[in-house]
Amino acid sequence: MPTNPNSCEVCSSSSNSSCNHFGARTCKACAAFFRRTVSMKLDYQCIDQPDACRVHCDSRVICRFCRLKKCHDIGMKPLLVKSKNERKNYIRISKGLIRKRSVLGDNVKENSEEIQNDDDPQESDAEMENESTPGPSSEPSENVSAENQETVTKFLKLEASMCDRRRLLYAETPISIVLESGKEWPYENAPLKMFDYKLSQGMSKHDFVMIMDYARGMPGFDEMNYADSVFCYRLVCAVDFVINSAYYTYKRGIEHNELVLSDGTFIPMVPTPLTGYEENANLLFQSQDDLMKFRTLMPLILHQWETCVPFAQLAPSHEEFCLLKAICVWHVSYYRLSEDGRRIAIAQRNRLIRALHHVCHLDSDDVGERFGNVMMALNYIMVNIRHVVSSFVMISFFGIINVDKSMISLTSFWNKSDTSTAPSL
């Protein structure tokens, strides 16, 4: 138990507005974790690590199994997590919501029920269905809620598969450990390697294979024609490069000032790395080719850091990250697809947006603010995607780096068209 009476009884945090949630004094983060776990009926396995299992806000990683156990131990009650049926026990008066509660006994309750039954049933149902915080879509039925949960689960599995492959390929994690339990990012508790521009060859064939599996697993991808599916796949590669690096950097801890790339390498960002354009920078390199390669890669990396900083401040949950990544793919690709492809893209994007709103509803007390902040992240992510695409084209076209042939094929279509992305939201 925490020594500070105002701190969270789960993680001992005293800086996150601790107050009573679900029957115990907890911070907002632990309350959101408990609400999401109960609402989505999630099960966890203990990772059996002393620092993580002690469940403390100072720990870099917190075991979710032990965190949930501690929530139960301090008296947090799953029954207090409001289900959809319980939310319907609120009625709208003017612009606010009040609880339908009888303080005089069953007679008043029965009278109120009779009055409600006299109302138009369609208006009553509509009122209850729209009582939730305004968003892209209120949840009008249990079917919509089930669809949202199915969408979340689908993309969690897709990202988990990619995470496992990167752990095997780049972190050299034994397969027995990979199969033991899933991770939210591939390099958790794994040593990172310093980035070496001399050894960098861009994305490898292994990367293209795992991204292909991810793309094919996206609902709607197999419904597109050949040209649309090729463009969508190429865009997934760019989105994965940008947003996964931002998420891995956030999970590593932005306070370390290290940019983590998808291949498990990192670049210290303090002091700010050189770009190769400084005065007399050529004296630091053995050859002109090394200087050109450095000048090509480092501005790309510095631009990526500009995405990582606000993304870490957003502090997305794993579910928000997975859904935002897919939303970005469909939103950007929409403007370059055929008419049939656009219909698929808009349907899938809207489905993902509804699922994201559902996740924000489970995680945050202020759903509208949280949902808006997550969606606004698309702006700076898409700006970086445009920069990455331009850099990939230049690298492949001029042969500055000895990249894989798949990389040349990946960027060939951008050589013939404008590299600008979709307008921001």
Swiss-Prot record:
A Pfam family: zf-C4
Gene Ontology terms for molecular function: DNA-binding transcription factor activity; sequence-specific DNA binding; zinc ion binding
PROSITE patterns for this protein: NR_LBD, NUCLEAR_REC_DBD_1, NUCLEAR_REC_DBD_2
InterPro entries xref list: NHR-like_dom_sf (IPR035500), Nucl_hrmn_rcpt_lig-bd (IPR000536), Znf_hrmn_rcpt (IPR001628), Znf_NHR/GATA (IPR013088)
Chief location category: nucleus
Protein name per UniProt: Nuclear hormone receptor family member nhr-13
Subcellular location: Nucleus
Biased composition (Low complexity): 131-142
Key words of the record: DNA-binding, Metal-binding, Nucleus, Receptor, Transcription, Transcription regulation, Zinc, Zinc-finger
Region (Disordered): 108-148
Zinc finger (NR C4-type): 11-30, 46-71
Membership in a protein family: Belongs to the nuclear hormone receptor family.
Organism the protein comes from: Caenorhabditis elegans
NR LBD domain ranges (all copies): 147-414
Biased composition (Acidic residues): 113-130
GO CC annotations on file: nucleus
Domain of life: Eukaryota
Function: Orphan nuclear receptor. Involved in regulating fatty acid desaturase genes, acting in concert with nuclear hormone receptor nhr-49.
DNA-binding region: 5-83
Subunit structure: May interact with nuclear hormone receptor nhr-49.
